[in-house]
């Protein structure tokens, strides 16, 4: 709209300027009407030599009115023709932009590195773009080397990093430590080098406990699985909510963990042929009922107890299988205490690495729980403590994002900008997010104002990039020849539309180059960033520095009174009496 107003103002000024020679010509015509064309030509020659020696006659006003009418008619004809044409853009106006001009528009003192010549400033109020970036690149397309590592070495944000294979941690952890960052690691590749992460530490009220169970169910459900009857998962959800809420409300802090949830499940005995059987867990909830009959935990447990004996046993088995990883001593050692201190992620310099294996997804549900609670905690701090944006910018770098089940990612991408949070979603191709997010997959590129394509070999991605580049108008030349006695030869010139890059040309993109889209600007093709050119490269393992080895923390000593002090034998006798 602003461009349209500017164009209209320019046209009006030009029309007024051109009206001056129209009036001059009208006065010249008026003083020559009596002598006809010969006198007009004579006066024209004299007027060109002395343009300001024109006399006013009794016919000057009429001449000005006639010439003005003709001038206005000509303007109307010109305007009507302009409204229906866009010369040179009949079939599309797509064109390549300049990397250096784009960089001049968006570069600031603190930036994200996008390509060799383009930076994106972290101050969103200046360029009015979100900092969310969708990075697409197949294996070997330099996603880690050309984007992940350079942006970590900028050390201008707090970071939450998904690190397949532990490559990024060993390469960049030492440099961030040198820059004063507090390094926290959830290491699922080598659990002995992991800090503790206990999801119970971030439960502030009953709503958080319910969210935790829902996230756990979603994260431990295999991708692509479809339940014919949701009864089982809902019943299992009610049972786990009851146990987790009970521990949250009644247990000492050292018993608030998932290994304790498994222990509580062991007390939930069910006998298929005896619906009146009272299990130790039943006794525990009866004791709770005396103290707090309106407890949400108690209500959820009563939902579970509505199931018959055989059905209840199946629900218990399903819940125990879902939580089986917490039986492992290594997982128990990590999840029984907490070192992540998620409340400070937006407060002071820190970097959190989630190291996941690239060939096994057994324990990646822990990363799903972690990320879900990070978003909840950061949103809480921004909204309730800082009443707006976090003091420190938090940059999520989700390398191989589809390998971690993040069902809330499309929603969070749409809401994180105002809280000083951004996300770099890194995928191999568009088919991955289409499979993972089904009908909502377009929300991810839609809420990422920057798209960086590094190359790949997947057909739907080639088509997507080609369509995003758009069509341009080109000149075409065709030749025709007719042979025979009256043969002829003809050449025709015309305009037609053509994609800026066709899908097969996108596939053939030189591995040294990438394609960059920033909302509201023309796409650019530029060289990928070269990691070895970064000023801090000498402090990393890639530049000859030592690898970073993270040392996990020791579980703190147990303090407080245990929850299970009930004499179950006496309670059973009292119940029978």
Question: Which residues make up each language-model segment?
Answer:
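Basic- and hydrophobic-enriched, low-structure N-terminal and domain-boundary segments
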Residues: 1-141, 145-148, 471, 482, ...
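Intrinsically disordered, low-complexity segments enriched in small/polar residues
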Residues: 32-34, 119, 272, 478, ...
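P-loop NTPase motor domains
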Residues: 129-421, 436, 446, 504-528, ...
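Low-complexity, polar-biased intrinsically disordered regions enriched in Pro/Ser/Thr/Gly
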Residues: 106-111, 221-231, 253, 476-494
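Conserved ATP-driven motor cores of ASCE-family P-loop NTPases powering translocation/secretion/packaging/pilus
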Residues: 413-415, 419-515
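Intrinsically disordered, low-complexity regions
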Residues: 38-41, 45, 99, 115-119, ...
């Amino acid at each position: 709209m602003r461009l349209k107003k500017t164009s209209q103002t320019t046209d009006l000024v030009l029309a007024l300027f051109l009206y001056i020679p129209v009036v001059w010509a009208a006065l010249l015509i008026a003083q020559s009407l009596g002598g006809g064309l010969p006198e007009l030509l004579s006066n024209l020659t004299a007027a060109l030599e002395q343009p300001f020696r024109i006399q006013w006659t009794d016919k000057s006003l009429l001449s000005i009115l006639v010439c003005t009418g003709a001038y206005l008619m000509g303007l109307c004809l010109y305007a009507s023709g302009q409204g229906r044409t866009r010369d040179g853009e009949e079939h599309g106006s797509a064109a390549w932009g300049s990397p250096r001009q784009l960089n001049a528009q968006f570069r600031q003192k603190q930036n994200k590195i996008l390509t060799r010549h383009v930076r994106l400033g972290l101050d969103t109020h200046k360029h009015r773009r979100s900092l969310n970036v969708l990075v697409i690149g197949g294996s070997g397309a330099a996603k880690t080397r050309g984007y992940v590592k350079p942006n970590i070495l900028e050390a201008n944000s707090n970071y939450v990093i998904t690190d397949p294979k532990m490559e990024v941690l060993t390469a960049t952890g030492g440099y961030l430590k040198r820059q004063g960052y507090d390094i926290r690691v959830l290491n699922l590749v080598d659990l002995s080098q992991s800090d503790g992460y206990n999801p119970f530490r971030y439960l502030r009220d009953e709503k958080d406990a319910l969210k935790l169970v829902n996230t756990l169910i979603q994260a431990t459900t295999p991708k692509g699985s479809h339940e014919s009857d949701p009864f089982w998962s809902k019943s299992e959800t009610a049972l786990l909510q009851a146990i987790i809420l009970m521990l949250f409300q009644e247990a000492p802090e050292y018993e608030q963990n998932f290994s304790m949830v498994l222990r509580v499940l062991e007390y939930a005995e069910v006998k298929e042929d005896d619906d009146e059987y009272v299990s130790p867990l039943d006794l525990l909830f009866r004791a709770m009922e005396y103290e707090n009959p309106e407890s949400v935990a108690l209500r959820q447990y009563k939902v579970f107890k509505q199931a018959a004996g055989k059905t209840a046993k199946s629900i218990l088995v399903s819940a125990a299988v879902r939580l089986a990883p917490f039986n492992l001593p290594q997982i128990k050692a990590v999840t029984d205490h907490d070192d992540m201190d998620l409340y400070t992620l937006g407060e002071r310099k820190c970097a959190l690495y989630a190291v996941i294996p690239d060939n096994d997804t057994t324990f990646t549900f822990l990363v799903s729980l972690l990320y879900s609670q990070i978003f909840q905690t950061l949103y809480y701090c921004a909204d309730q403590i800082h009443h707006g944006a976090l003091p420190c910018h938090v940059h999520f770098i989700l390398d191989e994002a589809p390998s971690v089940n993040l069902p809330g990612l499309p929603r969070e991408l749409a809401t994180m900008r105002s809280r000083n949070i951004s996300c770099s979603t890194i995928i191999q191709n568009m088919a991955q997010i289409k499979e993972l997010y089904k009908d909502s997959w377009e929300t991810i590129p839609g809420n990422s104002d920057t798209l960086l394509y590094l190359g790949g070999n997947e057909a739907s991605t080639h088509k997507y990039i080609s369509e995003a580049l758009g069509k341009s108008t080109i000149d075409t030349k065709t030749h025709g020849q007719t042979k025979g006695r009256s043969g002829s030869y003809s050449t025709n010139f015309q305009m037609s539309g053509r994609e800026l890059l066709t899908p097969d040309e996108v596939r053939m993109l030189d591995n040294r180059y990438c394609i960059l889209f920033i909302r509201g600007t023309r796409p650019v093709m530029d060289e990928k960033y070269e990691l070895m050119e970064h000023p801090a490269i000498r402090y990393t393992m890639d530049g000859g520095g030592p690898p970073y080895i993270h040392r996990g923390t020791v579980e703190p000593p147990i303090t407080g009174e245990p929850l299970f002090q009930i004499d179950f034998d006496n309670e059973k006798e009292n119940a029978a009496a």
